[in-house]
Amino acid sequence: MIKTLFIILLCGILSACQPVDIQDVDIAAPAPKRTVLKVGTLYGPQIYLNSEQGESGFDFEMAQRFADYLAVPLEMIPYTNRKQLFAALKENKIDIIAAGIAKTPNRSQQFKLGPTLYKVNQVLVYKEGTPEPKDISTLSGEITVMANSSSVNTLTKLQKDYPELMWNQVNDKDNEELFALIANGELNYTISDSNSLLINQRFLPELRAGMILEEKVEVVWLLPPNNSDRLMSKLLAFWHKERRAGTLEHLNEKYFGHVKRFDYVDTRAFIRAIDNILPEYRSFFEEYSGELDWRKLAAASYQESHWNPSARSPTGVRGMMMLTQPTAAYVGVDDRLDAEQSIRGGAFYLKDMMERLPDTISEAQRIWFALASYNIGLGHVEDARRLTESMGMDPSAWRDVKKVLPLLQQSKYYKQTRYGYARGSEAVHYVDSIRRYYDTLVWIDNQTKTMEIIEEKEQVEVIAEEVPAKSHVSAQ
């Protein structure tokens, strides 16, 4: 069921990961003054999503900050058609495009480009289990990309060195549909930016990254080519302010930092477990999570025990949440092998860790510090925070503390701390893994709900069609 769900809905939810070039559109009249900031975007987990938990995405968060900087409300306007998105900017229907757009010569000619958000590599994508390509010149005719995309720009550059290089262009499929076709073995190769591939691997683990075809491609916002000097000036001032504040680094860590480590076997196993094991315990996670998103608690439990109530480690921790005897006693768990008790106790302990953290840590980041504390202890995390501050970094930012945690394994650093040696790199891996599990679980959970809505709507339509027919038969 999950596999089918991926292929059917991957396009709709993640359609924004691969930007495309646009065709020339006539310039419209100057834009009137606006009382809101209208930002055109595309749907995608790293760009813009609007779910039960509210709006999210790298571009959304930056756009919200920019609107706050301008002291105007933000209006995000999602487009499903890229051509319409670019035309809307040319026609002054929107003020900015913030949609994970790659910088290309064509876009530089047609738009004003904002400062660089981040950089990506253009990589060859192929299927797990097939031979990894070593020479781009041997793949002529086997690469399929979207027409007018930045992938075409990459291939055109390569063609100068490999004149025989040819590729297939499709107009009726987007990048995520191409990913699904690669995963199913229906296509051999495509090209993607590295971040989009890493994000999609959480849902389609069969995707593999091959050779890097173009390095450090800039991702930018787009502004109208004319009558946007004032907005560009404000954007540049805002950008410098946010860079100094570490906002770009924080958002890069939030949306991309945890997806850079990919494990094919583990991802496939987790997807199967969501379908086969989680339903038995989901109600416990929902009941005891409280204000915490139940999927974060479930992700932590999978990292601990792979949802095995009888799990045991060599150090003596046991159960779904792998509690020690002292911790079990502290949270009121009598039987660590009882799944419900273990989940209840683990949830209580995790929330207790969150409450004991300093108030300087933001609500959004407290969970990551709490999970690290769950893994190696609150004392060691506080040691890492103090070291972080002594190095001139932010002790309340997970992006900085995760850099310092591995230093607790080096005597040069841990001898300066109160609690001494700790496996800090293990804690970083622990938190990153939970974040990946959580992202995958959220995606699958949202798609399941979408499918249920679609099926319910179809059933209503079928019933509506049948009722008149039955009434007509009765009248006879």
UniProtKB/Swiss-Prot annotation:
Keywords: Cell outer membrane, Cell wall biogenesis/degradation, Lyase, Membrane, Signal
Stretches that traverse the bilayer: none
SUPFAM superfamilies to which the protein is assigned, alphabetical: Lysozyme-like, Periplasmic binding protein-like II
Record-level GO cellular component terms: cell outer membrane
Presence of the UniProt keyword Cell wall biogenesis/degradation in the record: yes
Subcellular localization, as worded in the UniProt entry: Cell outer membrane
Membrane topology: Peripheral membrane protein
Catalytic activity entry: Exolytic cleavage of the (1->4)-beta-glycosidic linkage between N-acetylmuramic acid (MurNAc) and N-acetylglucosamine (GlcNAc) residues in peptidoglycan, from either the reducing or the non-reducing ends of the peptidoglycan chains, with concomitant formation of a 1,6-anhydrobond in the MurNAc residue
Gene3D superfamilies found in the cross-reference section: 1.10.530.10, Periplasmic binding protein-like II (3.40.190.10)
BP-aspect Gene Ontology terms: cell wall macromolecule catabolic process; cell wall organization; peptidoglycan catabolic process
Range of residues in the leader sequence: 1-16
Matches recorded under Pfam families: SBP_bac_3 (PF00497), SLT (PF01464)
Active-site feature positions: 304
CDD domains: MLTF-like, PBP2_YfhD_N
Region called LT domain, residue ranges: 260-476
Keyword Hydrolase: no
Family to which this protein belongs: In the N-terminal section; belongs to the bacterial solute-binding protein 3 family.
Entry function: Murein-degrading enzyme that degrades murein glycan strands and insoluble, high-molecular weight murein sacculi, with the concomitant formation of a 1,6-anhydromuramoyl product. Lytic transglycosylases (LTs) play an integral role in the metabolism of the peptidoglycan (PG) sacculus. Their lytic action creates space within the PG sacculus to allow for its expansion as well as for the insertion of various structures such as secretion systems and flagella.
Protein name: Membrane-bound lytic murein transglycosylase F
Source species: Shewanella frigidimarina (strain NCIMB 400)
